[in-house]
């Protein structure tokens, strides 16, 4: 039985052998916008179809929870790069329902890491980062649920 990696490499080899990517496309997006969205597996292909965008139209940045954490976090840096290197004129931020990030907390992920053998010493080094990143989502989720009642 083939491993997942072998399957992916076989698909890539066939893709390249059949020249399925023959059209040259500029690294500069034709529609001059960037899209920030979640890395959720349900959005693969769906987001492009839902928004009517195609290869070469936009810079697409995906991360867990469509998050923009920190004044100069990696997502902010990426967006700045799109503006000042790739001449992006607009940025669209698209979230989705039932986001896994909104349904978890720093306590949840730290518990899971602990149960997989990550030491308390290592967890202490990253605990604050997870609290800053994940716990505001939980607050927003509860606030949103309360507003719906």
Language-model segments: residues:
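Short, conserved "active-site rim" segments that organize catalytic pockets and cofactor/ligand binding
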Residues: 1-73
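A broad detector of short, well-ordered amphipathic alpha-helices
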Residues: 10, 76-80, 145
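A generic local secondary-structure boundary/capping motif
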Residues: 22-25, 80-83, 144
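Short HxH-centered metal-ligating active-site micro-motif
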Residues: 55-132
